[in-house]
Amino acid sequence: MAKKPSKKKVKRQVASGRAYIHASYNNTIVTITDPDGNPITWSSGGVIGYKGSRKGTPYAAQLAALDAAKKAMAYGMQSVDVIVRGTGAGREQAIRALQASGLQVKSIVDDTPVPHNGCRPKKKFRKAS
């Protein structure tokens, strides 16, 4: 039986999209989506090759953002709206890395979830105030 000729998968071209930066104390995850919110590519401190507490460093966040931006530019991405969630160490560095990668950053929105006095925080987070 003859083999069917396989069709080449065509990479869809997306000119603009959104970059979600989830910065926790343990890691920073950068997800780049199209304008509808469908993921195109993502990267994190762990994907870069760091393990343990090093994933939460600003340098790991910078490398993760550069990696995600490079992958997104392969899809024709030129500009992004940045949405930041979390209070981790890598949030500022990830934004700077996206700007330095060649992607045009149109806007930056802080969408960190803040409770309206919901669950009681753990002891280490109650001690602060």
Swiss-Prot record:
Question: Which InterPro entries has this protein been placed in?
Answer: Ribosomal_uS11 (IPR001971), Ribosomal_uS11_bac-type (IPR019981), Ribosomal_uS11_CS (IPR018102), Ribosomal_uS11_sf (IPR036967)
Q: Which molecular-function annotation in GO is an example for this chain?
A: structural constituent of ribosome
Provide ranges: composition bias, Basic residues. 119-129
Q: Which GO terms describe its biological process?
A: translation
- Annotated GO CC locations: ribonucleoprotein complex; ribosome
**What are the alphabetically sorted keywords of the record?**
Ribonucleoprotein, Ribosomal protein, RNA-binding, rRNA-binding
Q: How does it assemble?
A: Part of the 30S ribosomal subunit. Interacts with proteins S7 and S18. Binds to the C-terminus of IF-3; however exactly how IF-3 interacts with the 30S subunit is unclear. May contact the C-terminus of Era.
User: What job does this protein perform?
Assistant: Located on the upper part of the platform of the 30S subunit, where it bridges several disparate RNA helices of the 16S rRNA. Forms part of the Shine-Dalgarno cleft in the 70S ribosome, where it interacts both with the Shine-Dalgarno helix and mRNA.
NCBIfam families assigned:
PRK05309.1, uS11_bact
Q: Which family does it belong to?
A: Belongs to the universal ribosomal protein uS11 family.
Q: Kindly provide the name given to this protein in its UniProt entry.
A: Small ribosomal subunit protein uS11
Source organism per entry reads: Thermus thermophilus (strain ATCC 27634 / DSM 579 / HB8)
Q: What is the lineage of its organism?
A: Bacteria, Thermotogati, Deinococcota, Deinococci, Thermales
